[in-house]
Regions:
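Intrinsically disordered, low-complexity proline/glycine-rich segments
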Residues: 1-106
């Protein structure tokens, strides 16, 4: 089972495209928005529709993609829970690459 994703900048997201045409790649950003009342290792759980931090590279757009792949049967606040390997774009371009070492989600 994949590791649970944690918000508030705890876990990394690799971006092979960035969010603007002038972005250098590959680049790494962090998880951002998350649940305010369901926690994994004292960090909010990442959920369906939560956004990643803005791309950190100079010249990139400020678009913040939403989590679009997630657990099909574990829910946080009524939304699918994010996991290691889930994607913020749905096309494999903004993938969660770290997660909890002791909480796993189907």
């Amino acid at each position: 089972m994949p590791e649970a994703a944690r918000g508030s900048g705890k876990d990394t997201v690799d971006s092979d495209t960035g969010s603007g045409v002038d972005c250098a790649f590959p680049s790494t950003t962090k998880t951002d928005v998350c649940s305010s009342n369901v926690f994994v290792n004292n960090f909010g759980s990442v959920r369906q529709g939560d956004v990643v931090t803005s791309h950190p590279m100079t010249g990139c757009g400020s678009e913040s993609p939403k989590l679009s792949t997630y657990s099909p049967n574990v829910f946080v606040n009524g939304m699918g829970m994010g996991r290691l390997g889930d994607d913020y774009e749905g096309d494999g371009s903004n993938v969660i690459t770290s997660g909890s070492s002791n909480v796993f989600v189907n």
